[in-house]
C-alpha cells in the first residue's frame, strides 16, 4: 500500500487536498502533472506524461463524450499548463486499432506503426492543436481514468539491470508486471494493454530499459501510486547501497576548486573549438559530489563505454559519453588536451562505425559524430548543446544516467540498451521529423557575446539587441547592480531555459551579469574566466564602457582627467582584447570585437581634449588590434555622437550645463529624461538626418558588426551620428 505522506524519504509528497479539491478535472490533471514534475527524482525535464479520461460536451452534437487529455509532445510536467495537453475523442482512439489492423505493413517498428502517429490528429477534440505524444496509445489503451508514465532514476535502475524481470517481482511484490524493452508506439501500448488484461490486480507495469506506468480511477490515487512505485524502488536500492565501494570505489581524487577552475578555463575553449567542426556548441560544467564520485571511480571507464539505457537520456547524451583517461594526480592541462584530442578522434570513429553497423536503407544521414558529454576524472562532466538550455538538459540527463547506473550496480549489474535498439530510437523517422520541424536558428543562437558596459545606455541596448538574435549574453559592467538589472530584463523576456543541471555559475541561463573594471587586468581576466566556465568559450566582445570627464581650461591641471580618460577609453579596450585573445586562440573559432569610440575622434574642438584624443587613440587601437588578431578575429569600431538618452555620460548636471550653454529653455522641475530629450532634439538639428541618436541606433550597428553579415570587414569605424559632416572620415 502507498506510504503515509510523512513516511516518504526519496520523493516529495506534494499533494494538497485543499488545493486539488477546488480544481476542475482538467486543472486537477495539470496540478498532478506539475507536482510530479516538481520533484526531479520523479522524472527528468521533458520526460514522462500524464493523462485523464474525462467527460466533455461534443461541440458538434452537444452530447457528453469521453475525452482523453494527455500531456502533449514537447511539454514538461513541471511547467505544463492546460494548453500543453492534447485532447482526443476516446472512442475514435479505440476505433484506430481496426485501422492499424488493416495495414499490410503493420508490426513492431513498421512503417504502419509509425503511420499511426499521424492518425492521432484525426481524433482531436475541439480542434486542439497540441501535437499528441508518441505515448498516447498507452494512455488510451489502459482502461483506468488516470494514467502516469514516468522515468524516475530509481525505477530505471531496476529496468536497466541484468535481473530486471526477477527484481520486478521481488521489489514490488506482484503489484507491477514486467514487459521487456519495446520502442514506444502502438505495439508497445498493445503489449501493456494485454499485460494488464492478463494481470487485472496489478497497479502498473515496469517497462524494461525505460521506466514505468501506473494507473487509477482517481487522480490523487494515481499520484500516490506513482510515488509508491518510486519510493519502493529507492528503498530497495538504499538497502543494497555499496557505500564507499559504489562504482568499484574511488580511483582518483578531485582537484581543489581553484585548480579545477584554472584547468577548465584553458581546456574548455580548446574542447569547444575541437567539437565545433561543423557548428558551435555551448557548454555546461557539472562537478557536484555525485558526478565526481562517478568520474573518479574504478568502474567509470567500463560503465561509460556501455552507454546509457533510457531513450530519453541518449537522445541528448548520445549512445555514450567520451571518458578521458586523465590522471588528476599526475597530468596537467596540456596532457588533458592531448588525451582529449586522441579520445575525440576515437569517439568519432566509434560513432561512425555504430552508424554504419546499424543504419537501414531509409535511415537519415549521419549526424555530427562528436560527443555531447565529456567525463574528466578529478574535474567532473562537461555537457554540450546547441544552446545553454540544451546543454543543461544534456547534463541533467547524464546526471540521471549516473544515478541509474549507481542503482543498477547496487542491486544487480547495469546493462545498456543494445546498439541497434538505441540506433532505432536515435535515427527514428519520427525523431528525424521532429528535428526537421524545428524553426531555423537565429543569427547568434550559438554565440557567447560579452557586452562590457551593459548596465545602461548603449551597452544595455546592445545586450537587448544581440539577445533578440539568440545570443548568450554576458552583461558586464563596473556597476554590478546595473548589470544584474539588464540580465534580469533579458531573462524576463527570453526565459531561463529548461534543464536543471550545472554547477556554480554554469547553472546559469542565456544571460548572466558580471562585474568588471576594464582598467584592472585581474578583474578582466576573472570576468572572462567566469564566462568560460558558464558557457564554454567566447565568440564576440563588444566594449561600450567609456568615460567623459569635464576638464578645466588650465591644461596643466588636467593630468588626472587625461590619465583616467586614456585608462578607460584606450587601455581598457586593450586589456580586454589581450585577455580575450588567449581564449580566442585556444578556441580557434572565428570571432569579432567591437570597440566604442566617438565621432569626437575625428573633430577638433575645445573643452574635451582628454576625451577626444583618447577616442582618437581608441580608433587606432582598433586598427592595430584588427591586424594583430587577424585572421581569427574581426575588430571594428562603433563611433556614436550625442547619445543622450539613458547614458551615464550625460548625467543631469552635464545636461543642464549643455542646455544653458546653448540657451535652450528648461525648468528645474523637469525630469532628467525630459531634459535629455530637449538636448537630444537640439543635437538632432545639427545633423543631416535631423533625427535624435538613440542607444538602439548604436546597438543596431554593433549587432551588424558581430552578426557575420560584415564578415569581410575589419579595421573600420562605423559612425552612427545622424550625419555630422564635420566628422566624415577621410
Can you describe what each PLM-predicted range is?
Residues 630-634, 713-715:
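Short, small/polar-rich loop/turn modules that mediate ligand/substrate recognition or access, typified
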Residues 552-563, 683:
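Substrate-binding pocket helix/loop in short-chain dehydrogenase/reductase
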Residues 577, 614:
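Active-site helix of classical SDR
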Residues 1-449, 461:
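Glycine-rich flexible loops
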Residues 546, 703, 714-730:
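Short C-terminal tail/terminal secondary-structure segment
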Residues 554, 603-609, 690:
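Active-site loop immediately N-terminal to the catalytic Tyr-X3-Lys motif
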Residues 598:
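Residue(s) in the substrate-gating loop at a strand-loop-helix junction
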Amino acid at each position: 500500500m502507498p506510504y503515509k505522506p510523512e513516511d516518504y524519504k526519496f520523493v516529495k509528497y506534494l499533494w494538497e487536498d485543499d488545493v486539488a479539491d477546488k480544481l476542475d478535472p482538467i486543472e486537477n490533471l495539470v496540478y498532478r502533472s506539475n507536482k510530479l514534475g516538481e520533484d526531479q527524482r520523479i522524472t527528468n525535464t521533458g520526460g514522462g506524461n500524464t493523462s485523464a479520461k474525462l467527460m466533455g460536451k461534443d461541440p458538434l452534437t452537444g452530447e457528453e463524450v469521453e475525452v482523453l487529455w494527455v500531456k502533449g509532445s514537447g511539454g514538461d510536467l513541471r511547467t505544463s499548463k492546460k494548453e500543453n495537453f492534447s485532447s482526443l475523442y476516446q472512442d475514435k482512439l479505440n476505433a484506430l486499432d481496426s485501422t492499424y489492423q488493416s495495414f499490410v505493413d503493420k508490426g513492431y517498428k513498421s512503417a504502419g506503426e509509425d503511420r499511426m502517429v499521424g492518425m492521432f490528429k484525426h481524433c482531436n477534440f475541439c480542434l486542439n492543436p497540441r501535437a499528441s505524444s508518441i505515448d498516447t496509445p498507452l494512455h488510451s489503451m489502459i482502461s483506468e481514468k488516470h494514467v502516469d508514465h514516468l522515468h524516475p532514476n530509481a525505477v530505471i535502475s531496476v529496468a536497466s539491470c541484468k535481473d530486471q524481470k526477477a527484481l520486478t517481482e521481488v521489489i514490488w511484490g506482484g503489484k507491477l508486471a514486467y514487459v521487456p524493452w519495446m520502442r514506444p508506439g502502438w505495439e508497445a501500448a498493445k503489449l501493456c494493454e494485454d499485460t494488464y488484461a492478463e494481470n487485472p490486480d496489478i497497479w502498473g507495469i515496469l517497462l524494461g530499459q525505460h521506466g514505468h506506468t501506473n494507473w487509477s480511477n482517481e487522480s490523487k490515487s494515481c499520484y500516490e501510486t506513482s510515488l509508491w512505485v518510486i519510493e519502493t524502488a529507492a528503498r530497495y536500492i538504499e538497502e543494497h547501497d555499496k557505500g564507499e565501494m559504489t562504482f568499484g570505489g574511488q580511483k582518483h581524487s578531485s582537484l581543489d576548486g581553484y585548480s579545477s577552475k584554472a584547468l577548465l578555463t584553458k581546456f574548455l575553449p580548446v574542447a569547444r573549438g575541437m567539437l565545433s567542426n561543423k557548428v558551435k556548441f555551448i557548454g555546461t560544467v557539472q562537478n557536484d559530489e555525485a558526478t565526481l564520485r562517478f568520474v573518479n571511480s574504478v568502474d567509470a571507464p567500463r560503465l561509460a563505454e556501455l552507454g546509457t539505457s533510457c531513450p530519453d537520456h541518449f537522445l541528448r547524451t548520445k549512445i555514450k559519453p567520451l571518458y578521458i583517461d586523465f590522471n588528476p594526480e599526475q597530468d596537467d592541462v596540456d596532457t588533458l588536451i592531448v588525451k582529449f584530442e586522441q579520445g575525440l578522434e576515437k569517439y568519432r570513429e566509434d560513432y561512425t562505425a555504430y552508424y554504419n553497423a546499424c543504419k537501414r536503407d531509409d535511415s537519415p544521414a549521419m549526424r555530427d559524430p562528436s560527443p555531447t558529454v565529456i567525463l574528466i576524472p578529478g574535474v567532473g562532466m562537461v555537457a554540450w548543446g546547441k544552446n545553454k538550455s540544451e546543454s543543461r538538459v544534456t547534463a541533467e540527463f547524464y546526471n540521471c544516467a549516473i544515478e541509474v547506473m549507481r542503482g543498477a550496480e547496487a542491486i544487480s549489474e547495469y546493462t545498456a540498451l543494445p546498439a541497434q535498439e538505441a540506433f532505432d530510437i536515435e535515427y527514428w523517422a519520427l525523431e528525424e521529423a521532429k528535428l526537421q520541424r524545428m524553426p531555423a536558428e537565429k543569427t547568434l543562437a550559438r554565440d557567447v557575446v560579452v557586452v562590457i558596459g551593459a548596465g545602461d545606455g548603449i551597452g544595455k541596448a546592445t545586450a537587448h539587441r544581440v539577445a533578440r538574435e539568440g545570443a548568450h549574453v554576458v552583461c558586464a559592467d563596473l556597476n554590478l547592480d546595473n548589470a544584474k538589472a539588464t540580465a534580469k530584463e533579458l531573462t524576463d523576456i527570453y526565459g531561463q531555459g529548461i534543464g536543471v543541471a550545472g554547477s556554480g555559475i554554469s547553472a546559469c541561463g542565456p544571460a548572466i551579469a558580471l562585474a568588471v573594471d576594464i582598467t584592472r587586468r585581474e578583474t578582466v581576466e576573472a570576468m572572462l574566466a567566469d564566462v568560460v566556465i558558464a558557457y564554454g568559450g567566447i565568440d564576440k566582445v563588444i566594449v561600450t564602457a567609456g568615460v567623459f570627464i569635464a576638464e578645466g581650461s588650465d591644461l596643466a591641471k588636467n593630468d588626472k582627467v587625461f590619465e583616467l580618460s586614456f585608462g578607460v577609453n584606450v587601455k581598457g579596450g586593450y586589456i580586454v582584447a589581450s585577455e580575450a585573445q588567449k581564449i580566442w586562440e585556444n578556441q580557434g573559432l572565428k570571432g569579432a570585437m567591437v570597440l566604442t569610440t566617438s565621432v569626437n575622434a575625428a573633430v577638433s574642438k575645445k573643452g574635451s581634449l582628454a576625451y577626444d584624443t583618447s577616442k582618437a587613440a581608441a580608433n587606432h587601437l582598433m586598427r592595430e588590434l584588427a591586424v594583430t588578431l587577424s585572421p581569427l578575429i574581426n575588430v571594428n569600431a562603433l563611433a556614436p555622437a550625442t547619445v543622450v538618452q539613458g547614458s551615464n555620460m550625460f548625467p543631469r548636471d552635464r545636461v543642464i550645463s549643455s542646455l544653458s550653454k546653448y540657451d535652450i529653455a528648461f525648468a528645474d522641475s523637469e525630469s532628467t529624461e525630459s531634459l535629455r530629450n530637449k538636448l537630444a532634439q537640439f543635437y538632432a538639428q545639427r545633423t543631416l538626418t535631423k533625427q535624435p541618436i538613440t542607444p538602439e541606433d548604436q546597438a543596431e550597428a554593433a549587432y551588424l558588426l558581430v552578426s557575420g553579415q560584415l564578415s569581410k570587414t575589419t579595421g573600420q569605424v562605423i559612425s552612427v551620428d545622424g550625419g555630422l559632416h564635420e566628422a566624415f572620415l577621410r
